[in-house]
Amino acid sequence: MSETFAKRASRRGYDPRAIEERWQRRWAETGLYKTDEDPSKPKHYALTMLPYPSGDLHVGHWYAMTPSDTRARFMRMRGYRVFFPIGFDAFGLPAENAAIKRGIHPRDWTYSNIERMRGQLRQMGTMFDFDAEVVTCDPEYYRWNQWFFLKFYEKGLAYREKAPVDWCPSCNTTLAREQVVGPDRRCERCDTPVIKRNLAQWLFKITDYAEELLDFSEIEWPERVKALQRNWIGRSEGAEIEFEIEGYGGVTVFTTRPDTLFGATFFVVAPEHPAVESITTPERGEEVRAYVERAARMSEIDRADVTREKTGVFTGAYAVNPANGERIPVYVADYVLMGYGTGAIMAVPAHDERDFEFAKKHGIEIRTVIAPPDWDGSPLERAYVGEGQMVNSGPFDGTPSAEGREKVTGWLRERGVGRPAVNYRLRDWLISRQRYWGTPIPIVYCERCGTVPVPEEDLPVLLPEDAEFMPTGESPLKFNDEFRKTECPRCGGPAERETDTMDTFVDSSWYQYRYLSPHYEEGPFDPERGSRWLPVDQYTGGIEHATMHLLYTRFFTKVMRDLGLVDFDEPMLRLFNQGVILGPDGNRMSKSRGNVVNPQEYVDRYGSDVLRCYLMFIGPWDEGGPWDPGGIEGVARWLRRAFTLVAGGDVSEAEADPGELSRRTHRLVKRVTEYLEGFRFNTAIAALMEHTNYLLAVKGEVGEEEWREAMRSFLLVLAPFAPHHAEEMWEILGEEYSVHEQGWPSWDEELVREETVTLVVQVNGKLRDRVEAPAGVDEGRARELALSSERVRAHVEGRELRKTVYVPGRLINLVVS
């Protein structure tokens, strides 16, 4: 041998930071992570949620990104052409607040942070393709936000209407959410109670896609996300019923229980309902107006709180129950929300808990119309919301309530006062923001032509550099005459631009498409590249985005399909939600709490690979938990010891039996493969640690060729987790650059067959011991082995064994009483 790999290693020594800096330079110089476009390989578009450029990457960013990077590397080594881009979600309120605090422009603060974070992302050792980077505050990006707005507008999916905002009657201005303070919702500037006021706002008509958004058949997403979206969309089947209010006209309600109509003994409208002012009698006017003002100061969350006392006032008006012709009083009450249903309800106190509480308080009749089981006809002590026989319901008496819903709806339809209906809790997406640092909405207002969209050829409508962005509660662009005053693109006359900017969730609803061609000028993305890469194969990100970003991006994709931009229905085929790494105090990391953990001190002390591996080792990725650096030294020791496998002396020249080394190596490859497929990074690293110990124990007992082959496989499966260490050790081994361009090792099923397995033994679901058992052991023998353990016997002696739960080859649970 010309030179052993141990001698090559000894010349360099072990310096993780020097190793990492050297290989990061080499990777950049050789373009190692430039996206492979080889069409003969299967595609894998891996995407992690783009970060907000807040200044520095904290440990939470590392926790989100390094496992995603590890899996993308794994897929690349398995023979996929992998697209793994990164960008920055750069518009938004934090930039304005930081700029105000520091007295600088939001643009300067944002781009300075982006530059710093780029370097930190490279230091992390990721395989991001930075050539695909997008920055959402760049005009070449937000131009296409505006283009999408125009397309939505053409399709009737973007519209303007009055929507409630927080308003300070003393300052005579709207307030941003953060300017409303305290439990009683007061203006932070003047301490005046804040009210709700309707102002013209722009919305996207996501409700047009509500039904389709309930279809998850084409995607593999966590059940919890799907459940959250189903609940957010809130589909309900029932009936719309028209009640006549005396002296006013018809008001429609939606109910899921038309079978209870005969029990409606009062009627309730939300404080914001447009009928309130008209139906209120003069003698009730002052009380009703005061109540409406109080309700306007409350949040919808508070109003919907089921534990809160139900309040309301009589309007003086009466409605007519269409089922029996009875006059019933009309109340205004804040437990009815304008945003759900029609903003009016038929109140059936016997069969609705909120209505029951309200009726008790106001002395309103509570009439049972669905008989509970064994009901004796006496008044109900609490609302009965279950099924039963219809009673006190005229021609429907004796009808089962489930059947009665359909029959009553049909009866109402025949009479022209009702119809079957589907209702959704989902509201249209309000995209107007009265802030500066966002995408200008491409609309102008002309006295002659009305609302006029900006022509596509005039995009982008640029955000002015010299705007005053100090918060006033109104759109900062409103005070910039140079921006606001313009010509009507239709008639050439004087006009004014829309001065609201777009919700930043618009930016992140389609960014995965722009990554494909960040500088493409003919459309939002290059369709040719789109045909090669879309849709996203694997998305990773937090579950906190379930009902906003993850819903909005699905909506956007469906609209893009209907615009002919894509030929599929869903943006991301598979989704994995990682947990949240919390601050040392157990709270989510944030600069305002002062609990952000800066990873730089750990990188400086141990290197990036150690921090990467530690974050993946501390527990299941989908669980997260508080940051605790207590175990990081152990991970550092492991990688240092792993390095000695190629640096700590030569191996034997003897030809030893390679059987056990080969078997263990093949088992390692299979285990790590399966763990990575299932996002079980912690167990994969545990397997690598265990195998490292074994290799150190047998080093010197096998021949060089067998050792080299075992080391090749070990380094290949180590590479996605500790890319710098694996690259360094691969070179020391004498292999060609780069380990990350090698194929993933395979395994022989004959060699991975276990002769023995370790059974976890539980008693009543609690871990009591582990026992060795022959592979393929049956339940009876497994029970015998479990009961042979002294630890297990201590928990079962003198107790009756009632049941055995056996997971073959893995676990046995003895259920005793």
Swiss-Prot record:
Keywords annotated in UniProt: Aminoacyl-tRNA synthetase, ATP-binding, Cytoplasm, Ligase, Nucleotide-binding, Protein biosynthesis
Motif 'KMSKS' region per record, residues: 588-592
GO MF terms held by the record: aminoacyl-tRNA deacylase activity; ATP binding; leucine-tRNA ligase activity
EC number: 6.1.1.4
InterPro entries: aa-tRNA-synth_Ia, Leu-tRNA-ligase, Leu_tRNA-synth_edit, M/V/L/I-tRNA-synth_anticd-bd, Rossmann-like_a/b/a_fold, tRNAsynth_Ia_anticodon-bd, Val/Leu/Ile-tRNA-synth_edit
Primary location recorded for the protein, binned into one broad class: cytoplasm
Chain location of the short sequence motif 'HIGH' region per the record: 51-61
One GO CC annotation: cytosol
Residues binding ATP, per UniProt: K591
Pfam annotation, one family: tRNA-synt_1
Subcellular location: Cytoplasm
CDD domains according to UniProt: Anticodon_Ia_Leu_BEm, LeuRS_core
Catalytic activity reported: tRNA(Leu) + L-leucine + ATP = L-leucyl-tRNA(Leu) + AMP + diphosphate
Gene3D superfamilies per record: 3.10.20.590, HUPs (3.40.50.620), Isoleucyl-tRNA Synthetase, Domain 1 (1.10.730.10)
GO biological process annotation, one example: leucyl-tRNA aminoacylation
NCBIfam families: leuS_bact
PANTHER family referenced in this protein's UniProt entry, alphabetically: LEUCINE--TRNA LIGASE, MITOCHONDRIAL, LEUCYL-TRNA SYNTHETASE
Protein known as: Leucine--tRNA ligase
Organism: Rubrobacter xylanophilus (strain DSM 9941 / JCM 11954 / NBRC 16129 / PRD-1)
